[in-house]
C-alpha cells in the first residue's frame, strides 16, 4: 500500500508539506519509547505514536520509515514539522487513539 492510499483509507491529516507520498507501507509499529522504535521498527513501516517533538522526525529518517502517525490529536511542534520536511519524513495527525489506528492498520492488512 502506498502512503497516499493509507492517508485516504484512514482519513489522516497531512502535517508535512512537500514530502513524497509515493512510498510503500510494508508494516507497522506502535510505541512512544524512541529507543524501542529504533531497535524494533524497520524501513518502510508506518509508526504510530503520541509523541510530537522533533526527535520523531530524526528517528523516522534514521530508520527509513514510510510515515509517522501522531494519534490522539496530540500536538506536533512546528520545529518537528520543519525537521521532517527537510528529511522528507511524512507526518500525519489523527483524532483517533493509537489503539484505533493500529486496529485500522491491521484491518487494512498492514502488519509485521
Q: Which residues are covered by each model-predicted region?
A:
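Feature captures the catalytic cores and cofactor-binding loops of soluble hydro-lyases/lyases
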Residues: 23, 34-46, 50-112
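N-terminal first-folded block
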Residues: 3-45
Amino acid at each position: 500500500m502506498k502512503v497516499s492510499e493509507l492517508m485516504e483509507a484512514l482519513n489522516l491529516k497531512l502535517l508535512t508539506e512537500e514530502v513524497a507520498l509515493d512510498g510503500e507501507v510494508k508494516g507497522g509499529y506502535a510505541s512512544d519509547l524512541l529507543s524501542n522504535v529504533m531497535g524494533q521498527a524497520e524501513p518502510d513501516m508506518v509508526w504510530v505514536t503520541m509523541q510530537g517533538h522533533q526527535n520523531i522526525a530524526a528517528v523516522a529518517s534514521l530508520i527509513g520509515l514510510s510515515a509517522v502517525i501522531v494519534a490522539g490529536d496530540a500536538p506536533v511542534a512546528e520545529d518537528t514539522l520543519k525537521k521532517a520536511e527537510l528529511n522528507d519524513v511524512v507526518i500525519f495527525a489523527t483524532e483517533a487513539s493509537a489503539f484505533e489506528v493500529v486496529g485500522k492498520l491491521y484491518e487494512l492488512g498492514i502488519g509485521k
